[in-house]
A protein has these predicted regions:
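Membrane-anchoring hydrophobic helices of lipid-metabolizing enzymes
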Residues: 1-46, 55-59, 89-92, 170, ...
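Non-catalytic C-terminal accessory region of glycerolipid acyltransferases
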Residues: 4-8, 105-234
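Short, glycine/polar-rich helix-capping loops at beta-to-alpha or helix-loop-helix junctions
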Residues: 13, 78-83, 163-165
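A generic structural signal for well-ordered alpha-helical segments
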Residues: 20-22, 64, 87, 111, ...
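Structural motif corresponding to alpha-helix initiation and N-cap regions
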Residues: 29-32, 80, 102-105
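Catalytic core of membrane glycerolipid acyltransferases/transacylases, capturing the structured
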Residues: 39-99
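A conditional alpha-helix N-cap/helix-loop micro-motif detector
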Residues: 98-101, 134
């Protein structure tokens, strides 16, 4: 019964929020591979994205409008008077970063095995000014992807919302299976770190790709090259 209500509320939010979304976000969607442009997500999947603004999840509700999109939300969001109840109605998974409670991982795997689409922001928080983006990925994202065995759709946003001069830009990549990123001979713990880093690399490369396509690098904060690395590139 709760699953049905989540689907109904999700669609209610999309229908009532469609016009405000068009006016406030003005999102242009691009694809790494244009052959998948008109395809829809079939079956369970993880939408794995960089995290620039609080509204990233809202944008994906409309970008992937054909499916009911669920997400993970930190405890700080649930404490907000209006936002907390809204996230609950949308079926968000509660993540308490203040404790070592990883039950959200198993809950995420359970939802994916039931056929849902889940948005994950592996950085686990918004970046601060000057921090290299994307932030290091939490290994919990790799665990969920490996344990569930569902395809991961990498997505990048420039986070340009509520901006009349510059449109929001979203780049959708080709699906990736986490199992294909595992390295033989490594322990499970090592592979969680390896897979997380590989996913981060995919998102980082896509962010660079989006910047090239749009001519806008304002959402990028790159790692400074060491002197010896600069000599090699010169």
């Amino acid at each position: 019964m709760m699953s049905l209500w989540i689907r109904i509320f999700n669609w209610f939010a999309k229908i009532t929020g469609w016009l405000p979304f068009l006016l406030a976000f003005r999102t242009k969607v691009r694809y790494v591979d244009k052959s998948i442009q008109n395809s829809r997500i079939k079956g369970p999947a993880i939408i794995m994205s960089n995290h620039i603004q609080l509204f990233d999840y809202v944008v994906y509700l409309f970008v992937f409008w054909r499916r009911t999109i669920r997400t993970q939300a930190a405890e700080v969001l649930y404490r907000r008077p209006m936002l907390g109840p809204l996230l609950k109605q949308l079926g968000a998974i509660y993540v308490n970063r203040e404790t070592r409670d990883f039950s959200f991982c198993d809950e995420s795997v359970k939802l994916l095995r039931e056929g849902w689409v889940l948005t994950i922001f592996p950085e686990a928080r918004l970046p601060r000014d000057g921090e290299v983006r994307p932030l290091p990925f939490k290994t919990s994202s790799a665990y969920i992807a490996l344990k569930s065995g569902v395809p991961v759709i990498p997505v990048v946003t420039n986070g340009s919302y509520f901006n009349l001069k510059k449109r929001a830009q979203v780049l959708i990549g080709t699906p990736v299976m986490a199992a294909d990123l595992v390295e033989e001979g490594k322990t499970e713990k090592e592979n969680l770190r390896i897979v997380s880093e590989k996913f981060r690399g995919i998102i980082r490369d896509m962010a660079e790709d989006l910047a090239r396509r749009t001519g806008d690098e304002s959402f990028l904060v790159r790692e400074e090259k060491k002197p010896d690395e600069e000599e090699k590139t010169n």
